[in-house]
């Protein structure tokens, strides 16, 4: 056995050991997916908290935005509800006029136009500063909420120690392509394995942007840090959901996952947009990893394992693959140990997921292993080497302008660039 073969074997065995311990602990701590739904009412004599729903939109398709607003208008929430739709300098405002007019007579809906595109984070902040509800629900403009989402999230927020809570995500366009089916399974695993296990300890590490509720008192105290996030001296314009969640945890608040609060969001249906999305997510994850490591001292041992597993695991897998490739090039022999180990771990993981979800389709998630090895791992390496790049890759960089607070005008603008739904 030459040096490369030995290195590949050691790396893949270390990866297998770490993954086995991490995934076993994750399954052990995962909340059951069939737990009784969150139900009940606020404590006796207390009213339901008021909720502000904030929906930033940028060049969103009229039908997609209309479906999103319809799902919010039909919420069964018993408390006061206000909705803020923030148009972030869209070029297709003429096309959206009909959607706005549809809800113009509903006193719950407020439409705000920003004069120029400032980015999703600043669009959110513009609405946060003009609203006053007890709770703030961030919703992406391509997301459809189940009728009871706000009620279920608000019930979770009854505990004053909870600063944020997220719902379960699914792909609304799941049946569109093989990739959307794969992403839908990826979302299920991320929510019902990763987030569910983290929620056991009140430390969900990322309350995902399509459907996340925050306590206003906690949010306001962190707003300046959230707005002015910088990396290597430059403004950080993406990964807002992960960064805000980490800030909540640093401030001592719990972050929770509510599996029965289901939201369906549009996911990329082709490889190009998917890889651009993954590149942004990888950069934001790496940027916030240092903040996450600062939390380790106060976290449960499982959460420490979670942070280590998600960062060291891919590194060990990459080392094994690189050494295996070097072995093949230099000796012409196949690194069978690494290949068989990866195949075995894939089969076990997909089988466990299929059993827990009671859906055989999860056996097909094995395809994700090939995508991970040949596309996502190199992409993450590139992301690590280009951390200072804050380009969304699908639109021009956001300008730093002030919110004028104007009501939504009807400008004569035409054309359409990439929407937020393509950027998440």
UniProtKB/Swiss-Prot annotation:
Q: How does it sit in the membrane?
A: Peripheral membrane protein
The record lists the organism as Mesorhizobium japonicum (strain LMG 29417 / CECT 9101 / MAFF 303099)
- Keywords tagged on the record: Cell membrane, Glycosyltransferase, Membrane, Nodulation, Transferase
Chief subcellular location: membrane
**UniProt cross-references to SUPFAM superfamilies, sorted A to Z:** Nucleotide-diphospho-sugar transferases
CDD domains per UniProt: CESA_like
Pfam name, any one: Glycos_transf_2
List the molecular function annotations (GO) for this entry. Answer: hyaluronan synthase activity
Name of the featured protein:
N-acetylglucosaminyltransferase
Give the family, as the similarity comment puts it.
Belongs to the NodC/HAS family.
